[in-house]
């Protein structure tokens, strides 16, 4: 996604630098964390997991006063080989292990000392955002998983289908297998919650439907990205997945969100 204008009254800053959150630190890409054996209390940090050779891959760890959550889980190693007609092999599907951050994500979570995740949020169904969801659900206890509904039928561009349904179904099947509460129809009440000291407000979280009662047609799943705005220690951080302005989402949300201190988007 390319952000080609100021987002309402937003202040845009590079996400690749360490940013002070009051007395605490939001870790930048590539920042190292010393191993911890127990969760840290009184600490508020946002970890932007190193994305190696894939600038679009997202996995963001929220850490607040001994509580943890993931926004996106990054690219993993698996992809459809075409043997199942439900998941055809299409051009554009990521097949190179070079782009997978599954091992890196787990290593980082273990170094931090994450015992469980209060929630996971999949911004949208592209593999570089939720490819690793099923692996995370297998490895860690997760209380809640936010993920909007998806269907291949809603994507109008063949070039935007990739392995979306494969990732989506893998994530939901894993959540069901491990008894995780999945929230797919996010209500206004569901959209605002706390993680330790962090106040989290979701935007663009509602499933949109057309006159036929089916999910509204879109060219690609990027416009469906859930936005999370985290406020902690007087600072506001925008985590936007791959949201774009093709259907005017940026114009609509900018005035609602207002000025932020840090933006992270792809």
Residue ranges and their predicted role:
Residues 6, 10-35:
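Sec-dependent N-terminal signal peptides of Gram-positive bacterial secreted proteins and lipoproteins
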Residues 36-115, 184-265:
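Core dinuclear metal-dependent hydrolase active-site scaffold
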Residues 115-128:
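Metallo-beta-lactamase
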Residues 120-123, 148, 266:
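Conserved residues at the C-terminal ends of beta-strands
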Residues 122, 130-139, 155-168:
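Metal-dependent catalytic neighborhoods of phosphoester/phosphodiester hydrolases
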Residues 137-141, 255-258:
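Short, conserved loop/helix-junction motifs that constitute active-site signature segments
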Residues 140-144, 178-180:
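A short helix->loop->beta-strand "cap" motif at the edges of active sites that frequently abuts
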Residues 143-152, 264:
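Short internal beta-strands
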């Amino acid at each position: 996604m390319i952000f080609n204008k100021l987002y309402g009254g937003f202040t845009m800053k590079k996400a690749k630098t360490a940013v002070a959150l009051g007395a605490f630190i939001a870790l930048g890409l590539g920042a190292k964390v010393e191993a911890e054996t127990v969760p840290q209390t009184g600490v508020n940090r946002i970890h932007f997991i190193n994305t190696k050779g894939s600038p679009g891959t997202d996995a963001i760890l929220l850490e607040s006063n001994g509580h943890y959550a993931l926004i996106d889980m990054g690219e993993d190693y698996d992809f459809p080989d075409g043997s199942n007609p439900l998941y055809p092999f299409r051009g554009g599907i990521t097949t190179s292990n070079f782009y997978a951050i599954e091992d890196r994500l787990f290593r980082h979570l273990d170094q931090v000392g994450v015992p469980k995740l209060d929630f996971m949020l999949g911004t949208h169904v592209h593999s570089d955002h939720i490819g690793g969801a099923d692996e995370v659900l297998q490895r860690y206890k997760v209380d809640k998983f936010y993920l909007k509904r998806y269907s291949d039928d809603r994507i109008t561009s063949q070039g935007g289908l990739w392995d979306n349904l494969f990732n989506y179904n893998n994530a939901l099947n894993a959540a069901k297998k491990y008894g995780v509460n999945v929230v797919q129809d996010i209500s206004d009440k569901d959209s605002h919650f706390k993680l330790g000291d962090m106040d989290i407000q979701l935007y663009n979280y509602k499933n949109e439907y057309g006159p036929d009662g089916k999910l509204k047609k879109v060219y690609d799943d990027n416009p469906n990205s859930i936005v999370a705005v985290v406020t902690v220690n007087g600072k506001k951080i925008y985590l936007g997945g791959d949201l774009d302005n093709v259907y005017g989402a940026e114009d609509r949300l900018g005035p609602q969100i207002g000025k932020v201190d840090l933006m992270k988007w792809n």
